[in-house]
Amino acid sequence: MTSPHLNYDTISDNYNQRYPSTFHWDRGDALLDLARQVDAKAVLEVGSGTGYWLNLLNQVTPQLYGLDFSAGMIAQARNQPTPLKLTQGTATRLPYQAESFDLLYCVDAIHHFGDHAAFVREAFRVLKPGGALAVIGHDPYGNDFSLYFYDYFETVYETDLKRYPSSSALKEMMKQAGFQNIERLNVEHVLSIYKGEQVLSDPFIKHNATSQLALLSEEMYQAGIERIKADVRRAQSNNEQAIFKSDFWVRMIMGMKP
């Protein structure tokens, strides 16, 4: 199944603005715990973006490798305080020798990889025996998943269903590739509630803050913003506040290479 492709070179300069410097991410703790569990000496992030998560793993090892399709993102990652070994390439044909890494992971990135099963097979190839694959992100197929901007921006939810593998499908891909001890873990609970006009300050609702919104034309994006503003005004006219709520779990699907 094909899905829209986002040119990250066009948004790389400001992409890290979505990560407030004072915010603590539980998914980062999960990554650190896993890296220590497998005693990771060499780590690869596929879809490494600006290097935000790789920089965190400097607490475990200095051998940090990142692969990204976007030259703009790689340029941004070179600004991280931690020296990173960065390569431009594709997730389905990893440019590394077999059995090179102790930990391979991606965060909020697998929906960009196209052939998810091919990525999982490549991950198995480049991991050392005893190494771990971790895929971290959300699952729009889940019944417990609620993201308020799905209700306001046309085509966004349908596009996500085309791009994301479900947790169960991803676990089956790992099994078919040869991974064992496959688990699905809830690693971070995202609960954000904006009241009234506060919603317009949500950093994740900026046009280029997420791939979901960045894929929209300016016209479609502004139409969604106007729908939000209309709900705010409608509530105000009734002496009420419109509530905009996102509530979901970030999941880590992980497996071990025997």
How would you label these PLM feature ranges?
Residues 162-177:
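Short alpha-helix
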Residues 50, 183-258:
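Conserved Class I S-adenosyl-L-methionine
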Residues 108-109:
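Short catalytic micro-motifs in class I SAM-dependent methyltransferases
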Residues 1-39, 52-56, 73-76, 132-161:
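Conserved class I S-adenosyl-L-methionine
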Residues 117-129:
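A short glycine-rich, Lys/Arg-flanked "PGG" loop and its adjoining helix->strand segment in the class I
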Residues 44-46, 50-93:
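Class I SAM-dependent methyltransferase SAM/SAH-binding core
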Residues 105:
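A conserved beta-strand element that flanks and buttresses the S-adenosyl-L-methionine
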